[in-house]
Amino acid sequence: MLLEVKDLKVEFPTRQGLVKAVNGVTFSVDSGETVAIVGESGSGKSVTSLAVMRLLQSPGRVSGGSITFDGADILALSENEMESVRGAKISMIFQEPMTSLNPVYRVGDQIVEAIQTHTDLKYKEAMERAVEMLRVVGIPSPEDRANDYPHQMSGGMRQRVMIAMALSCNPKLLIADEPTTALDVTIQAQILDLIYNLREKFNMGVMLITHDLGVVSEVADRVVVMYCGQVVETARVDQLFERPLHPYTLGLLQSIPRLEDDDSKRLYMIRGSVPNPLHLPAGCPFSDRCDSCFERCRREVPELRPVPGSPDRTCRCFLVEEGSDDDR
């Protein structure tokens, strides 16, 4: 297994109390596989990715669990050892490329800096590699565009530059945090196709952070659904779309607009909002928003358990435990 996260806990001490942003998250990513981490804002998915990269900002801290990458305990590495992993073996691309690129440096030089940080290449050789990576990600006239500043490029081109930078040192794992949110639909499709094709070409694992299940259906192999810092369901992508088990997953799927729906049909909306992490419900965190909630849900916190008859998927719901998911 390339990446294995077990019972990960991340906390943020605040004046109001302790925020458990990630609370016992477990999942894995293998080489050549795309695992999508899905959830609303505040679900803990981005904090999970930052924990894997060891980029948590103070006062955030990992308070429990383990992160194993390619056989190494990420949490036990020194900062110098982690710097040799970050950017070289694990790379990350972010939601808004304009804020990730330095506006006063040419994009080619920014890729060169990433390459020289992790290799012994001289500037000329590193620039040749940077130009080649720009070509790989589909930027036309890469020799010329390497001399451009970020503001001279469109949003889609800037995201391609970020992908070129992330892949310049041949990482084994790519973490993509909402890589298409700031782009229009046509460019979104191009970037997703690019990530998929590069995954196939380099046999790298991809950890895709997103709230968009439409994106998930296009590129993911497996899905991890998060809510309030916990994993509530894991499944192969075909299983999840064919038969979602957790009411939250079902709500996310039902809220996707479909072309075949009647214009007069009201779009489904999950009622309420994500609860304050300082004041979670006593039982299941989703109980106040769940249409299938019953008394046990308000008293007890369900555990993430294997689904009977489907050993490769899990669900955190009493309905599934009791065999009452009603074949949804």
What are these regions (language model features)?
Residues 74-91, 109, 117, 239-244, ...:
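ABC ATPase NBD coupling module
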Residues 140-144, 234-328:
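Short catalytic/signature loops enriched in Gly
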Residues 120, 124-139, 146-147, 242, ...:
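ABC ATPase nucleotide-binding domain helical subdomain, centered on the C-loop/LSGGQ "ABC signature"
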Residues 2, 11-24, 55-61, 78-81, ...:
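A short, flexible loop at the N-terminus of ABC-type nucleotide-binding domains that lies
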Residues 168-172:
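A short, proline-enriched helix->beta-strand linker immediately N-terminal to the Walker B motif
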